[in-house]
Amino acid sequence: EDQAEIVGVFHSHPNHPPTPSQADLASCEYLDLPFYIVTPETSDWYYFEPSGYEKSLIGREWVWDIQDCWSLITDWYKQKKNIVIKHWKRPKSPKEFSESPLFEYGLPKVGFVEIDENDETEVGDVLLMDTTNTGKLDHVALYVGDQTILQHCVKRLSSRETYDQKWIECTKKRYRYAQ
């Protein structure tokens, strides 16, 4: 990037057809670059360009920094509120992130403010959670009303879930987008 203009993304799907995954389609949109996918064993190629693809909020595969709990929040705000949340620099891997979660740092930088524990939870509030009981705030979910959250846990598909006692106990802080 510092030495020349990036004109496309080339990558392979070993032992699989070159059909784009949800993450490929999302990355293509995010980077605004054409993608070329090859299956090395067969030399089959697939080419595609940004086309306005929007990821579904429910049922997406978990991929760090592309389709994870934080990207679910930003995608919900874009799709439901027409608000584009700025990206903030995150560690390159989930392992690095787990050692030093940065949600408390990142949320205020992109327009969220912590809300008082006495305030009612509203649709669109971000719930900052400690899911490992280690004191590290390692997960975010989105309150969508009617005691329901939208979330994307590691190695699971994104889903709506009841905001029950388990998730309430994991919730340590709540943030609201300050428009």
Describe these PLM feature segments:
Residues 9, 35-37, 174:
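Conserved beta-strand scaffold positions in the cores of enzyme catalytic domains, especially
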Residues 82-95:
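Short acidic alpha-helical/loop segments enriched in Asp/Glu that coordinate divalent cations
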Residues 52-62:
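Short, flexible active-site loops
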Residues 92-158:
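...with weaker cross-activation on analogous glycine-rich loops/strands in unrelated enzymes
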Residues 63-80:
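Active-site nucleophilic cysteine motif
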Residues 30-54:
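Divalent-metal-activated hydrolytic enzyme cores
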Residues 1-24, 28:
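Short HxH-centered metal-ligating active-site micro-motif
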Residues 161-179:
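Glycine- and charge-enriched low-complexity intrinsically disordered segments
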